[in-house]
Amino acid sequence: MGAMHSRGKGISSSALPYKRTPPTWLKTAASDVEEMITKAAKKGQMPSQIGVLLRDQHGIPLVKSVTGSKILRILKAHGLAPEIPEDLYFLIKKAVAIRKHLERNRKDKDSKFRLILVESRIHRLARYYKRTKKLPPTWKYESTTASTLVA
């Protein structure tokens, strides 16, 4: 699936291994991996950053193959999951940065247009997360309070 507001089709993606068992060379236990995940989350890292950290520094290719559950599910079990889903959080962060830019550069028409696209993505994603009950039904994106959500 391609990016929402672009021309490309976006066909390339990484191939997941067929075997869902942990690699034979990996000697880390599931409890140790969960402990690493909770430590990283307490430091304030997002689930995707935790996955990159485990892959690059500890050599754990897939958390699900080792522990049996994904990073976000482990964080929810320990009460460390972010209140706003990660992709929505970063879209809000981008919208806040564009608004800050537009305060300094009022005539930047391209940024105004990009802000409209980003905010439409935010509204669409928020609608999806309300439907799947990952956000409360009363949650609403407002540009005036967005900077407090990201801070």
Curated annotation (Swiss-Prot):
One of its GO terms (molecular function) is small ribosomal subunit rRNA binding. The lineage of its organism: Eukaryota, Viridiplantae, Streptophyta, Embryophyta, Tracheophyta. GO terms for cellular component: cytosolic small ribosomal subunit; nucleolus. Belongs to the universal ribosomal protein uS15 family. This is Small ribosomal subunit protein uS15. One of its GO terms (biological process) is translation. The gene is RPS13. It comes from Zea mays. Pfam families: Ribosomal_S13_N (PF08069), Ribosomal_S15 (PF00312). SUPFAM superfamilies: S15/NS1 RNA-binding domain. InterPro entries: Ribosomal_uS15, Ribosomal_uS15_arc_euk, Ribosomal_uS15_N, uS15_NS1_RNA-bd_sf. Keywords: Ribonucleoprotein, Ribosomal protein.
